[in-house]
Amino acid sequence: RAGFLGGVTGHVYAVDGISFSIAKGETLSLVGESGCGKSTVGKAILRLFDITGGQVMLDGTRIDDMPAATLRPMRRRMQVVFQDPYSSLNPRMRVRDILAEPIRNFGLAKDSADLEKRVGDLMDRVRLPRDAVGRWPHEFSGGQRQRIAIARALITRPSLIVADEPVSALDVSVQAQVLNLLMDLQDRFGLSYLFVSHDLAVVNLMCDDVMVLQHGQVVEAGTAKEIFQNAQHAYTQTLLAAIPGYSK
């Protein structure tokens, strides 16, 4: 916080005192209104910026203070799916190249035939036709673009995926399809999700555990059943009351 003549009068933390763990194959949701710090937590875990205190552990290894060269192979084990599938995909690249680029960068394919097979397998996993790899991102619907983004996140076989409002930009009818896909992939590959959302109706469908943030701090945490059936904090109760047709 800046004071008179540019002096520092204090520090404001975007998030503070947050601690959690996510078991293999489970989903933890961070929920709260815009600006509460939930996306900041996801970015901190992904090491998109450095934290000023605390620790981030991935599969038992501390990564928050890890040098960039050491961190690179660890990045294979954590991926992200962003809110807006269109802005997260390069509009100048065909889908084949969007998926092939990280496969090449990580040296995952033995040869060109193996590369093509891997790209095709990814399309199968997200239930898109293989022959669509020659198309551009703008030729797909929003839900299809998000499937492509999910396919890209699967390339390195991560143990953790940070899903930052992954369906909030989609029509309600498409949201359910994408959420079902995420849950099916979780069952198949044992994925852990950090699911960032402001939509508690979606969270109730998707998540095992819930952490409610307000002004960068946790106000309530528990299993999804505990939160949705017996919320204790007034802020959580307000969020739940905003769900159309909500009842315990």
Model-assigned labels for residue ranges:
Residues 1-245:
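ABC transporter nucleotide-binding domains
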